[in-house]
Curated annotation (Swiss-Prot):
Role this protein plays: Site-specific recombination protein.
Protein name per Swiss-Prot or TrEMBL: R46 site-specific recombinase
Domain Resolvase/invertase-type recombinase catalytic: 2-137
Family matches, as SUPFAM superfamilies: Homeodomain-like, Resolvase-like
GO BP, one annotated term: DNA integration
Family listed: Belongs to the site-specific recombinase resolvase family.
Annotation: DNA-binding region: 161-180
Organism: Escherichia coli
UniProt entry tagged with the keyword DNA-binding: yes
Listed InterPro entries: Homeodomain-like_sf (IPR009057), Recombinase_CS (IPR006118), Resolv_N (IPR006119), Resolvase-like_N_sf (IPR036162), Resolvase_HTH_dom (IPR006120), SSR_resolvase (IPR050639)
Active-site residues, record numbering mapped to chain: 10
Gene3D superfamilies in alphabetical order: 6.10.250.10, Homeodomain-like, Resolvase, N-terminal catalytic domain
Length: 190
């Protein structure tokens, strides 16, 4: 029996470290840990594909949590069937469950359905919160970088603060702040 491990995070900004540490503590060699940095809904999971090719009958695949393996209930059922057909057991460390035996497979299926429902509920709440925030005028995304040089160039051409703000799609108060900062800098040079 060989131990393999699988870890996945949903975005490239998240870290696999905690999952990998847990797999190593459970006895998986670093060379037998396969990882993916992609959404569970993504079908491009090279680490999982490689793991599926490497495992053989009698091997055990460890995964830190149930929701780290499959995209949804159907995917989890498909993956557990594939591993089962190969004679490979899948054990979920934190959840304390395994696909060994019929009862284990049933528990995995039920918990996968619960996890999928929870993901959908979280997505709904997130979207509702976004919609509410948009109605309140809250903007999302990175703050725009204001081009101070454009403000100063337009001002030197005789353009007024209101027109500068309109042309550059910034607040008039921002234009005044930039002009005020620039005049302070010029005064300090004297």
């Amino acid at each position: 029996m060989r131990l393999f491990g699988y870890a996945r995070v949903s975005t490239s900004q998240q870290s696999l470290d905690i999952q990998i540490k847990g797999l190593k503590e459970a006895g998986v060699k670093a060379s037998r840990i396969f990882t993916d940095k992609a959404s569970g809904s993504s079908t491009d999971r090279k680490g999982l594909d490689l793991l599926r090719m490497k495992v053989e009958e009698g091997d055990v695949t460890l995964v830190k949590k149930l929701d780290r393996l499959g995209r949804d209930t159907a995917d989890m059922i498909q993956l557990t069937k594939e591993f089962d057909a190969q004679g490979v057991a899948v054990r979920f460390i934190d959840d304390g469950i395994s696909t060994d035996g019929e009862m284990g497979k049933m528990v995995v299926t039920i918990l996968s359905a619960v996890a999928q429902a929870e993901r959908r509920r979280i997505l709904e709440r997130t979207n509702e919160g976004r919609q509410e925030a948009k109605l309140k005028g809250i903007r999302f995304g990175r703050k725009r970088i204001i081009d101070r040089n454009s403000v100063l160039a337009l001002h030197q051409q005789g353009t007024g603060a209101t027109d500068i703000a309109r042309r550059l799609s910034i607040a008039r108060s921002t234009v005044y702040k930039i002009l005020e900062d620039e005049s302070r800098v010029n005064l300090s040079k004297i």
